[in-house]
Amino acid sequence: MSQPRRRVSKIILSLSLTATMVAGLGYGVAGASNFDVADKPLDLGNPEVGMTIEQSQFIAHQLRPVPLKLKLKKGPRPAMLKWVASDLDDDPFMKDDAWRYVRKGYKQGQIIRKRESIWSKAYFPGSRAIQYAFVSYDSRGYPMTATATLVLPPHAKENANILQWNQFINSSGPKCKVTTQLNQPDSWGIVNSPIQIMSAALILGHPVLFTDAEGPRNSYAINRLASHVLLDSMRMVHKQKDFPLRQSHFVSMGISHGGLQTGYAAVEQPHYAPELTPYIEQFIVNEGAPDFIKLAHSLGLYGDLSKVPSPWAGFLVSFIVGAIREYGDMVPHMEHWLTPYGKTVVKTSRNLCMPFSTVAGGGGLLKYMVKDGFFKSTTFKTMMQIAKDSSSFYYPGAPKAPTLLIHGTTDEILFQADQDKALWQRYCKAGTNTVYQQVPLGTHFTTPVVSLPRMVVQTLLSLNGVRQIPSCKIPMIL
């Protein structure tokens, strides 16, 4: 057994033993006194196993509305809390120093530094890969360094249309970013093979843009931050001078976690990057989760599902880590609420890449991660506000660019086919060119496979300027 696998096996065994001890010693119900009690604690209602839209909205209406636009700031971001920071060294190329350049007058998408990616040639033979660090903004409007990799096929033409691939990461470790993957021979556990499906676009002469949508702090599933990275990477492509792409158009697509990023970018783009509207041919959102209030329930944070082990708890743990990294100054007492088991899970997850991050948190009972009283606390209410702010379902706008939503009706992780259907109806009423592709009996893992031909055809058409035909009367059945 290799050293990394041996190390991960020990971690998983440790978590299992810790969980057993926690259950036996009753840490999950340890009192936390009346410390941090919210003035108006959230009423979570009594959500069903397949939480309805109305039950999610009941919780959402107790929280602040999601702002349509953010006020962009110039100063540095609030410091990240040390206990959620990875203890692995990050690539210096990712240094979060954008605020210094903003004070010099740099705008969104303006390049801070760049480098050639040598190892990308192993994945995409014959192509040139350039990695850029550029100015973007986080989910609260603070300047942030974003990174992306632009792969140029040898036969690319001037102003060729570009495929933006938004990779599913599901991780918290600094070695998980696509830019890092493509710049080293061993990315410590991340699955590299999915990014190679982009080779088809390269063969046809279309550049491919890989985004690092978790930002420099590896903040998993903070979707407004991810949206800014995606949109500012398009701006960056128009500004770079390594190859003439100033008038290039984009097709932006993602699956699962990549779908979360893409879906939020689609809905926020008219207000964050309105000048890009003529340049975006298509957003493709496959198996995204637009409603994080429901997702927290589906993954076992609260309600009846919190009483059974969740095989997907690792996703929720990664989100908790990402939320604390992004909003640490707003949830300063989160560490206080964690049990010893919870602290062990967080400490482990902050370094891991998929699939290890999923395995390490899987099968756990999330109620054992926090002390009794947590769900009445200001900290929990703030975390649910963060979840709402990361939900494209609760964003008050609609896309301007054509948007394709794809979801399986029996998705066993997200349970959000109804949410996508509701978004489709909402976007149609707003005048968006929208299609909802429904996959009967499709699961989270089979839906992308079954819908792959549809995605490929629409991608190729859109890259050649042929936009999708809107369908607002009935869902398309695949």
Model regions and ranges:
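Catalytic-loop region of hydrolases
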Residues: A32-K157
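Accessory cap/linker subdomain of secreted extracellular hydrolases
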Residues: P41-D97, N286-P396
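Short beta-strand element of the alpha/beta-hydrolase
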Residues: T147-L150, N159-S171, T180
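Alpha/beta-hydrolase active-site loop
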Residues: S193, Y220-D242
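Primarily recognizes the serine-hydrolase "nucleophile elbow" in alpha/beta-hydrolase
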Residues: R235-S306
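C-terminal catalytic histidine-bearing segment of alpha/beta-hydrolase fold enzymes
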Residues: M384-A387, I406, K421-L478
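Short beta-strand/loop motif that positions the catalytic acidic residue
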Residues: P399, L404-D411
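Conserved alpha/beta-hydrolase "acid-adjacent" motif
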Residues: E412-Q419
